[in-house]
Amino acid sequence: VDRTLRGLLGMRPRAVVTPRADRPVRVRRETSAVVVGGGIAGVSAALVLAERGVRVTLLEAAGQLGGRLRAWPVTLPDGAVAQVEHGFHGFFRQYYTWRSMLRRIDPELGFLRPLPGYPVISRAWPAEDFASLPALPPVNLLALLIRSPSLRLRDLRHVDRAAAATLLEFDRTRTYARLDGVTAAELLDRLGMPDRARAVLFEVFGHSFFNREESFSAAELVAQFHFYFLGNPEGLGMDVTADDHGSSVWAPLGGLLDRLGVDVRTGAPVDRLERTAVGWRTVASGGSTVDAEHAVVGLDPTALRRLVTASDGLPAPLRTRVAGLTVSAPYAVARFWTDRPVRADRPVFSGVSREPTLDSITVYSRLEDGARQWAGRTGGEVIELHAYAAEDGLTAADAASRMWTELGGLWPEVAGLRVLHRETRVGHDAPGFPPGSDASRPGVRTGDPTLLLAGDWVRLPFASALMERAATTGLLAANDVLARAGARAEPVTTVRPRGLLAR
């Protein structure tokens, strides 16, 4: 029945790049690429290129690969070394491209575990968990209307039908033409949802893209609602790594890159690019250089703007487009090691609604092996609190204190815990998607076929987001290099490209 419904509704993965069987797998001529940025986008590009015979140098400014999925060690007061990360990341099952990269280190993805659920909690309303909804659209939407106390069938009488229809009519061209000049807040106002539904269904979802509703494109919100819910045949279930991201993801990927012959250099920031007779030269502050025929740049918007400003020989339209890129509101992450655990029935991960600062809670000692071992040895707990769109100017220490206080209002037993150690940070490098930004947003291609861009901020002709958008743009950049060298493209798959009611 499920297979029949998927066929009738067109709810199945769709190929957006199909390799030509008459092209060779490996490049026909010797060629090279320098990849600037060792996050998901850059590593995805480097991995595919190296597999196909391209000589690759990968340059990463930080001391570890990973970008915003990076992990790094800290020493706790008891002398134990723990790994901390940028924040919780869910590996959704429609992340087809990112998962295809990860299958190169484990075809069975055995290092991923299903997250049992992820309720949205608040002080105002009972917790609500959406992970158990049926996977298949629109059955998932019907089940939501039947099951959810936040949005009941009778509430639909007061909802603006035209605004609601936009959620089911996603079309990459029409949706952005109609809604990219509108804020997500304005669209939600038009919808006229009950306050609880707006808070629990939409605001929590929107915050997970690190953008505030008043500065987030309504078209981007609709695209992501399509990608995760209304066009996604895999459902809202997600997986998490069995251990920290460094151990589960980056150590194996780094080892694979080494075996493929990639020259991986961490702690290697690039100051500028220079055009050469045969391609591109990267120049570091100390003067070291790397020459290659192709350059794939997978940096965050701020780092990319800085690189483009310092570089000569770049296409003028690219300079203009990159200058218009923005970052979103700052995000804050705080990880706490405590002397005792929280209640045993607390979920591993919770979204949080309507707190001033706190957006999510993760009990890492019930999620990742390293944190679980520390908790088992000490009797404590490892808890991470995350603010996805914090106020400007908020310090890491203040954010941590606020979020801990807000957690106490949601989980009262927290007041009795003693914090043994905490690690705090504020980041300001997540991409912004403000209204009106789509038309000028850079794509993978720059106007120079030897210079390509990749990242979770890059414009795509189909809906995608976060880790999957980063991996997909990296793969598309690699495909352009492969095409120039006469090799077969790597396949790219995504969700149904258009909404159920798209005309």
Where are these regions (language model features)?
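Conserved flavin/dinucleotide-binding core of flavoenzymes
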Residues: 2-21, 73, 346-503
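Mid-domain catalytic core of redox enzymes
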Residues: 2-14, 29, 268-383, 388-394, ...
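N-terminal Rossmann-like FAD-binding beta1-loop-alpha1 element of flavoenzymes
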Residues: 28-58
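Conserved Rossmann-like nucleotide-cofactor binding loop
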Residues: 41, 64, 302
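Glycine-rich FAD pyrophosphate-binding loop
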Residues: 50-75
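Conserved FAD-binding subdomain of flavin-dependent enzymes
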Residues: 77-112
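Mobile amphipathic helical/loop "lid" adjacent to a hydrophobic cofactor/ligand pocket
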Residues: 98-99, 103-105, 109-218
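Helical element adjacent to the flavin cofactor pocket in flavoenzyme catalytic cores
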Residues: 224-284, 290
